[in-house]
């Protein structure tokens, strides 16, 4: 399994933009786009839950080369909380209800634009990792918090 790469993020951004999908990069892939020095095996997307957005996402994912089953497409359209896709050119995790984030609209209002990539704010990435409470997420929290503080200080100037 290959690591998440910038080119994959570009392909995702461009395909989802062509189909008008509302989403945010979240998780470690989102942190990496913000400059966090780490690797991950997949792209994590927080997707706005609505039938229209889900249908647009299915079209975009198929355009990217994913071989979706009818059941997977239906899960995406209805906004199943979590959909993991390994049937394409890279691994993709779609999260419609991430732990630690109440509403997509709130995360969207706090988003950070990085070269046209809509990315969850570091505070939201941290909140989600903390709420998930997996060992690997707990282990990364101190580094993510230190990065967030560094990132915030650089933005202030």
Which residues does each PLM region occupy?
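Compositionally biased terminal segments of proteins
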Residues: 1-157
């Amino acid at each position: 399994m290959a690591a998440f790469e910038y080119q994959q993020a570009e392909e995702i951004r461009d395909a989802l933009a062509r189909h008008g999908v509302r989403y945010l990069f979240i998780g470690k892939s989102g942190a990496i786009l913000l400059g966090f020095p780490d690797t991950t095996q997949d792209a994590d997307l927080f997707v706005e839950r609505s039938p229209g957005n889900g249908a647009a996402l299915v079209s975009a994912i198929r355009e990217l080369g994913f071989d979706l089953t009818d059941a997977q497409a239906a899960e995406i359209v209805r906004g199943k909380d979590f959909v993991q896709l390994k049937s394409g050119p890279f691994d993709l995790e779609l999260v419609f209800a991430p732990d630690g984030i109440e509403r997509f609209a709130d995360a969207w209002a706090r988003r950070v634009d990085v070269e046209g990539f809509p990315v969850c704010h570091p505070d939201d990435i941290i909140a989600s990792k903390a709420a998930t409470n997996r060992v690997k997420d707990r282990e990364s929290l101190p580094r993510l918090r230190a990065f967030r503080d560094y990132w915030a200080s650089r933005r202030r100037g």
